Every structure is written in structure tokens, then in C-alpha cells.
Amino acid sequence: MTHNVMCDDVLPQLNLPDGVTRWNANLLEEERRLRNSDGHADRIILTINTLGKRSKEAQSLNTILTSVPRLRENRDARLYLLCHGGRGVGILKIGVKRLFVVPPSHAGLMEIEPVCVLDFFVDTSNQRQGYGKILFEHMLAFERLSPGDVAIDRPSVKFLAFLRKHYGLVEYTPQSNNFVVFHKYFERHQQQRRGVGGSGRSGYQHCNETTTQQLGTQSGLLEDINQTHPAPSYALRGVVMGHTGPPLDLTNVTQQQKPYHQPFATGRKTSYELQYERYLQSQNCRPTGNAGYGGGNGPASSAEVRATNCQARRRTSPTRSGVPYNIINGSTGS
């Protein structure tokens, strides 16, 4: 199958209310054990696997990042599934990763354990209707996170544009592991270390520090997933746990969106802004059709743009997910 052809598996009808449900391996196994007399749990599993395949093809990845077998391999991972009209619309997979990154304040490595967005996909027939924002914000609400608290595994330029438009997230330091950690993350947790405030949801420490204490926990992902959590401090509709919950009114969802606006400093453009301009130019030059998906015309990730600019210094490195990320050699040669 070529990248220009999306997975043609038909998404089954689900007995789930419109809105977001949250799943992990344990909940899926419980659903299959207790509520599968009519094949309902099997249809949920088929939906997750199908959307995972479509995500892989849409992003031109070498491997499927989201599937029920992968959730069984990483039992701390959580999957947010958005449904509308009784069918799956989008998926968002998260998990905690231990990362070694260079913060913006100094050149030394720092160890952090943030919640990471590992896969984020809205079915192509439902894009540009506000579903991605619904899915992302419901994840933030349940994980008690702000947008700048999450790290993102190899985000596309489209995802970076989404974060800038809705949350004003722009500045980040390119990392060799191709995770994007915005400067807001470090600013927030520097304040937390000084006791000024913060969510306490993501921990970090410098590699040369002797203390083993880290801020917060692993974002609650090691907690019992069925544990009762306090309600969010703001109104939230349609977020459900497993198979129960109120319906979500998705009528006129695009009209309900109000993008987050943040003033940006004028003057020299950031590296992200230059990447974003390249992405917009590629969209203008793209032939009509399924823009942004498949073949060599797809938008490059921030790491790919940076690696391409380095030409001879470019190399690939396998990762835990099997995706060959572009990273930069320290030497000037190949």
C-alpha cells in the first residue's frame, strides 16, 4: 500500500456517546471481558487499530505507533478516543518518557520525565472541524496539564502550527532526540523548584545534581486509572471514562472555537517561524488533492527540516518506536 492511499478498513459503529473516552490496556481487557456479548469491545479495538493505521499512513511513518497490542506492551500509556455519530474520529496517545534534553538556560543536559504526546491523529474526512482541539484539550484537562507541560515526539509542522495558533507555543530548543519541549515547560518548573507555583505534574533534574528528588510524579500515569480524581476547575463536557459519560454536543464546533492569541516580539524570526513559512510555501505549491499526506510532498518535521539544512551531517537513528529520526552529528563530516 502506498502512502497516497489511506487505510480503507471501515470504522465500525460503536455504542459510545459522542465525546472523548479514555482507555488503557486494563480497561480494554475489562470491556472485552464484561461487555462484549454483542461484540462491542471488539469494535472498539478495531476502531483503535484502524485509526492507528491511518495515522501511520497519513504521517508517512515506518511503523504503527498506536494499536491495542502496543497499549498492552506499555500498560502505563493512555489513549484518548474521540467519537462522533457513533464512530471513531480521532485518537491521542500519551505516555511518560525519560528524556535527556538541553534546556534554554544553559548548555548542560537535564533529565526530565514529562507527559509526551506519542501519536495525535484526526481522520482525514473529519479534519478542519475543530475535533483536534477538542481531543487535545480534554487530554490536558484529565491529566491536569497546561499546553506547555507536554513534550511531543517528532511533531509535524502542522502540529506545531496547531500549538502556536491555539496556545501561543513557539519557542523551543532543538533536541537530538527529536522531542520538542517548549521553553514554557522549563519556565514553569523553574518556578516550581523555587516554590512559586506550578502544576507539579512533570518532574526534572539536572544530570550533574546529586539529589534524586524529582518534582511531582510521572503525571499520574502510574496511578490506578480508576481512581477518583477531583473535577476540573472549569466546565468540561463530554469527557468520559471507559464506556460511561454524558454526551458531547459537537454542533457548530468550529464556530465555538476561540483561538488563543499571544503577542509575539517583532524583529528577527525564530527558527520555528522559518520552518512554518517553508511549510506554508509547500502547501501553496502542492497539487490539489489530499494536501499534507503521502509521498515526498508531505510536510517535514522540524527535525527533518533541520537535518536537511545540515546536508552531509545528516544521519538516521532508530528509536524505540522504530521510526528513523533525523539527528545531527557533532562533526562536520558525514
UniProtKB/Swiss-Prot annotation:
Acetyl-CoA binds at residues 120-133, 156-165. Keywords: Acyltransferase, Transferase. Pfam families: Acetyltransf_16 (PF05301). InterPro entries: Acyl_CoA_acyltransferase, Atat, GNAT_ATAT. It catalyses: L-lysyl-[alpha-tubulin] + acetyl-CoA = N(6)-acetyl-L-lysyl-[alpha-tubulin] + CoA + H(+). The record marks Q59 as: Crucial for catalytic activity. PANTHER family: ALPHA-TUBULIN N-ACETYLTRANSFERASE 1. Belongs to the acetyltransferase ATAT1 family. This is Alpha-tubulin N-acetyltransferase.
